[in-house]
Amino acid sequence: MLRSLRSQRQTARVSIEREPLLTAGIGLMLVQYVESETAWIPSAVKGTTNGAVAASEAAKLGVPWGVSVWCDLEGVKPGTPAQKVIDYCNSWHAAVSGGGYVPGVYVGYHAGLTPTQLYRSLRFTHYWGAYNLNTDQYPAVRGLQMKQLRPARKDVVPNFGIDFQIDKISADALGGRPTLLALEGWPELP
């Protein structure tokens, strides 16, 4: 399960939501959504600020170091120079890794970077793709470790009050995998 983190607004819940998920056998990672899914302009300053907030919120939720925290990269305003996107992402990465977490990037619609830029210009080694991300948009060489799936009726869990999505997790082309918080003895990936 991916739990969202605030970028500017206060987190609605704290660690009280963590334990029921873990007890139910659900692994937990964190994602910080961007300010707009349609037209935002990234910068190095925003990356540093948002990354610091993500690391701080992860700590407030009681998530231990070493768990993946994901940067949402989508909705970049068309025409934004790629270097601004790169600076945002690398600053976000530095802040999150400086907090002890494993930074990953969610590549969604209008990410503002080419597959080669995603792989060669960013510090990230963990990539997660939107359900509508085509294979020719995946980070060059490495590929994805997680792929969001289209929601299906069978994915709804009865009597579970949290909205969630299904993602397929696998090793990328270089053997990398995301890390998550789970109870001791949680199944390992094949």
Descriptions of predicted regions:
Residues M1, I26-Q32, V67-C71, P103-V105, ...:
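Hydrophobic faces of well-ordered beta-strands that scaffold small-molecule active sites
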Residues M1-N90, G98:
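Substrate-binding cleft of extracellular glycoside hydrolase catalytic domains
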Residues R3-R6, Y33-E35, E74-V76, G108-G112, ...:
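Active-site beta-loop-alpha junctions enriched in small/polar residues
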Residues W40, E57, W65-W70, A111-N132:
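Accessory recognition modules or surfaces
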Residues S97-T114:
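Aromatic-lined carbohydrate-recognition surfaces of secreted/lumenal glycan-active proteins
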Residues Q117-P190:
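Functionally critical loop-and-helix segments that line ligand-binding/catalytic clefts
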